[in-house]
Amino acid sequence: MPKRILQGVVVGDKNEKTVVVRVERRFAHPLLQKTVRRSKKYKAHDENNQYKIGDTVSIEECAPISKDKRWTVISAQGK
């Protein structure tokens, strides 16, 4: 099974070797058919503490690293 890859914005970098990434998804409301935005935060592993708040990054699913971390940052798209 391929690993999932998501794109999001770093919203937290205070933890050691961890960043919090907000991933936004859009979908049509089932009744109103209006486009709705929902977001979810994921904790991702950042080995070198190189990503800062505001960076757009790609995260990839991985084996559990800690209680909450199951994602790792693979690349940055820019600010």
Swiss-Prot record:
It holds the Pfam family Ribosomal_S17. InterPro entries: NA-bd_OB-fold (IPR012340), Ribosomal_uS17 (IPR000266), Ribosomal_uS17_bact/chlr (IPR019984). GO terms for cellular component: cytosolic small ribosomal subunit. GO terms for molecular function: rRNA binding; structural constituent of ribosome. One of the primary rRNA binding proteins, it binds specifically to the 5'-end of 16S ribosomal RNA. Part of the 30S ribosomal subunit. This is Small ribosomal subunit protein uS17.
